[in-house]
Amino acid sequence: ANKFKNSACSLAVITVKDGQIIKKAYSLIKPPFMSFDDECIEIHGIQPKDVLHEKTFDQLWNAIYENHLKGNIMVAHNAKFDMNVLRATLDYYKIPWPELDYACTVKLSRAVWPDLVNHKLNTMAAYIGVEFKHHYALDDAETCAKVVLEAAKLKGVNSLPDLLKATGVPLEPFIDDKNRSAQDALHKEPEPEQMSFF
């Protein structure tokens, strides 16, 4: 919605199993503060009135995690950005970070199709023949999944771990040593002498 990373106003998740898309989830999100930057509205087309009566992220998270993310590898295009948005939003609602791994389809696209003019999601969609509405979260997520499936087909592998191994693209932890201490501090119970009473 705005420049703050915890201001996501929509989310989408696509679940892939055995090379097939088996589940989809999409929702608008009411962000913590109803402040929308014009530049952001121009990108995704979502306005404050669209999310006024939608659920907040914390009301959606458990279902998304249990039904789509738990036990799976997350994949996103320019994943570092999406992971930072997810971390910031989890932090805002004081939700512990999940123990998950993720991979980036920008890195994957560069490894599999190095000669393309660029590896933006709309470029990849056009290259693999997928029509989609850019910056509409569900289409973005589905296109991302199809990039992975096309790359796996090209490399002759049947799983994401095998694809990453074949291309040298890293599988990255959502919680690494660098950010684990900050996450632990956020959720640590205060010692008795640190407690304040009002």
Predicted segments with their positions:
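Conserved non-catalytic scaffold segment of RNase H-like nuclease domains
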Residues: 1-99, 114, 119-135
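Ser/Thr-centric signal marking residues that sit
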Residues: 27, 105, 144
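Acidic active-site catalytic centers that drive phospho-/nucleotidyl reactions
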Residues: 78, 82, 104, 140
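Buried hydrophobic packing segments
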Residues: 86, 108, 144-148
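Acidic, divalent-metal-coordinating active-site segment for phosphoryl/phosphodiester hydrolysis
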Residues: 137-151
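Acidic two-metal-ion nuclease catalytic site recognized across multiple nuclease folds
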Residues: 149-198
